[in-house]
């Protein structure tokens, strides 16, 4: 018997999602890690203190509260929703996986607006569905008519990342509202970056049964390593999600830390303001550098285009890495030729990035 003979076709057809890691021979302190939109603007000491309080209050010999119920209770109370309208999981990625388990099978279709987060397509293909990509307009706005034209009776889900990764812009509420009213399926609005933007559609959950809002603690709270994502939706959607989730899917440390972090919201809100201010500082500096053009951002990252004629985004990204600054080359994506995404860091990181970028453009 060959193992590949009994492996599902959908698994054979996908490849492992690659993530750039820091070279072991270089210390993390030396590297400006600005490629994965993690929040290093929050001092690590602050996070460590919360973790210490967590470890003093839990017993990891016991199984965690089932289905993330401790975190679910804290989140629902914080947002003003009932616990029956919230589902939590190991990162937003697992929420996507759970949505696919509920809604997608072979023959199902999932619409994505591109360019956007690639994991929507990854999970769709894993469950035998097909992704129907719809391009954003040249100004990165939603083409609602094009989305609705692509939908048919087999279309189960529509993913809209707002603010969008990697373009950085938040979509118009009027466009999202029209999709909710006219799309005959579940509209998943990924608000992982919403804390850095001006508005949210999360309260629309009370008005639209087909709205599911996806959020994360990785960005605004700087807790990417703990892996906690959550979904706010109608009780019917959440009920189906709960049916397919494992009983102990979120560990005790993560759940308790999330509860404690939410109690310190005023602190994290100030850190969000700091990131937004640093984003504006970074934007102004990028606008003053010949050879690049930055795009407006409602997130904790900025997308910019390499416009110097003899360079590509891949070359600049490689040169930046040689200077111990990691950024994300997005130049291979549709509409984003020669574009690079950089995470907003603390001032030291941002200054190092600006210096490395200038050198990389002139090398």
Question: Predicted regions: what is each one?
Answer:
Residues 276, 289-323, 340:
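Conserved PLP-binding catalytic core of the aspartate aminotransferase-like
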Residues 44, 67, 210-288, 293-295:
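PLP-dependent aminotransferase class I/II
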Residues 102-160:
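PLP-dependent aminotransferase-like
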Residues 69-109:
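Phosphate-binding glycine-rich loop
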Residues 138-195:
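Active-site phosphate-binding strand-loop segment of PLP-dependent enzymes
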Residues 82-86, 106-109, 154, 191, ...:
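Short acidic capping loops at alpha-helix termini that bridge into adjacent secondary structure
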Residues 309, 322-323, 332-363:
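PLP-dependent enzyme catalytic core of the Aspartate aminotransferase-like
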Residues 1-62:
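N-terminal "arm"/small-domain region of PLP-dependent enzymes with the aminotransferase-like
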């Amino acid at each position: 018997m060959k193992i590949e003979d009994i492996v599902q076709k959908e698994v054979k057809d996908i490849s492992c999602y690659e993530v750039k890691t820091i070279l072991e021979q270089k210390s993390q302190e030396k590297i400006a890690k600005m490629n994965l939109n993690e929040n290093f603007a929050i001092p690590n000491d602050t996070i460590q203190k919360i973790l210490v309080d967590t470890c003093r209050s839990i017993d990891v010999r016991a199984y965690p509260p089932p289905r993330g119920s401790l975190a679910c209770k804290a989140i629902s109370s914080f947002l003003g929703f009932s616990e029956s309208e919230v589902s939590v999981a190991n990162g937003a990625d697992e929420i996507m996986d759970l949505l696919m388990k509920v809604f997608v099978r072979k023959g199902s279709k999932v619409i994505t607006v591109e360019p956007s987060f690639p994991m929507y397509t990854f999970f769709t293909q894993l469950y035998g569905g097909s992704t129907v990509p719809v391009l954003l307009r040249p100004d990165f706005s939603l083409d609602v008519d094009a989305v609705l034209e692509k939908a048919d009776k087999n279309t189960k889900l529509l993913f809209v990342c707002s603010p969008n990764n990697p373009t950085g812009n938040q979509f118009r509420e009027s466009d999202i509202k029209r999709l909710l009213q006219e799309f005959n399926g579940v509209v998943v609005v990924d608000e992982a970056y919403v804390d850095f933007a001006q508005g949210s559609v999360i309260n629309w959950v009370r008005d639209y049964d087909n709205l599911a809002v996806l959020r994360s603690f990785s960005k605004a709270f700087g807790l990417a390593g703990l892996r906690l994502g959550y979904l706010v939706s109608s009780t019917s959607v959440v009920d189906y999600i709960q049916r397919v989730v494992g009983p102990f899917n979120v560990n005790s440390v993560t759940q308790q830390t999330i509860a404690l972090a939410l109690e310190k919201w005023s602190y994290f809100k100030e850190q969000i303001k700091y990131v937004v201010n640093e984003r504006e500082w970074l934007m102004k500096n990028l606008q003053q550098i010949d050879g690049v053009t930055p795009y407006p951002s409602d997130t904790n990252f900025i997308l910019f285009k390499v416009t110097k004629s003899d360079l590509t985004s891949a070359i600049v990204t490689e040169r930046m890495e040689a200077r111990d600054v990691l950024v994300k080359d997005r130049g291979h994506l549709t509409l984003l030729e020669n574009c690079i995404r950089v995470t907003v860091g603390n001032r030291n990181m941002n200054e190092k990035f600006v210096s490395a970028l200038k050198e990389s453009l002139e090398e």
